[in-house]
Swiss-Prot record:
Keyword Signal: yes
Segment forming the signal sequence: 1-31
One Pfam family it belongs to: Lipoprotein_3
UniProt protein name: Uncharacterized protein MPN_639
Organism for this UniProt entry: Mycoplasma pneumoniae (strain ATCC 29342 / M129 / Subtype 1) (Mycoplasmoides pneumoniae)
InterPro entries: Lipoprotein_3
Key words of the record: Signal
Presence of keyword Signal: yes
Family per similarity comment: Belongs to the MG439/MG440 family.
Length: 287
């Protein structure tokens, strides 16, 4: 009896080995080390292996393994995905029409403020670099009606030497009634400039105000990018950067605001250790 059972068990084990080997082979293939140097290579791989777009952990693991084989090439790929999503796919303009794709990449409940960079109140970091009066003006009287990425250039030498520059043109709508009291407070120390700004506000009633914002990213002083930056549990590929924001405008009212002593610092400021999650841009580029 026991001998018969042992014989059946041995037969079952031997019969199961091919299936088990196939399963293990398939699992290994999902996270196999593949050297990737460009977005097109990753897109081709994703076409052959749909698990990369179905499972975020699989995609991050694949990218992490690639980084171990070719750090510069993989980092270049991530920057390329970032540029492709912002410039070619125009995510800041189309995020509301690409709802499913956007939510899968950036998470449910995400909006244009989830995209880096952007020219909204949050994207321009006004709460961190302006007076209360400017914040109130922006929050209560100014809305961003349209954003367009005009330029995205980057260069990657290594994880310690890279730079990306993104230029965004934003169309702003200003509510004259809500803005007037804030304009009075901003220019309260200069009656001539206050009247000029009020006249500009009246003249611009109902028109879009143009704003140009340039965001430059370079390595932060702390937190060097490496394999530990690929976190598959939080779906995060964190790039620590030093961020420089430069703002300019060709519209009369915006120029007056930027030239005011209270607001002139908005024209050019830098922030160290600004984190950018490169993962959602890469995933968006594959969907």
């Amino acid at each position: 009896m026991l001998g018969s059972m042992a014989l059946k068990l041995r037969k079952w084990i031997w019969a199961s080995i091919p299936s088990l080997a196939l399963i293990l082979s398939s699992c290994s293939a999902l996270v196999a080390s593949v050297e990737l140097k460009s977005l097109s290579e990753l897109q081709n791989l994703a076409d052959r292996n749909t698990e990369l777009t179905k499972n975020k952990r699989t995609l991050i693991t694949t990218l992490r393994e690639s980084y171990g084989l070719n750090p510069k090439g993989t980092l270049n790929l991530l920057f390329e995905g970032w540029r492709y999503t912002l410039l070619s796919q125009r995510i800041l303009e189309r995020w509301q029409t690409e709802v499913g794709r956007f939510a899968k990449s950036f998470g449910n409940g995400s909006n244009q403020n989830s995209v880096q960079p952007n020219a909204t109140l949050k994207g321009l970091k006004l709460s961190e670099r302006s007076t209360t009066e400017i914040q109130l003006l922006a929050e209560q009287a100014i809305t961003v009606s349209k954003q367009e990425v005009k330029e995205f250039t980057y260069k990657v030498e290594s994880n310690k030497q890279f730079e990306a520059t993104v230029k965004i043109k934003a169309d702003l709508k200003i509510d004259p009634t809500k803005a007037m009291s804030h304009i009075e407070n901003i220019f309260k120390d200069d009656e001539t400039k206050k009247k000029d700004a009020q006249n500009s506000l009246t003249m611009s009633m109902g028109q879009n105000e143009a704003l140009e914002a340039t965001f430059t990213y370079s390595p932060a002083t702390q937190g060097i990018f490496g394999r530990a930056s690929f976190d598959r549990f939080t779906s995060n590929i964190k790039l620590n950067t030093k961020l420089r924001i430069q703002v300019s405008s060709t519209s009369d009212l915006m120029k007056k605001l930027l030239e005011n002593s209270l607001t002139s610092s908005l024209k050019d400021q830098s922030f160290d250790n600004e984190g950018v999650n490169l993962f959602p841009y890469t995933l968006f580029a594959l969907l």
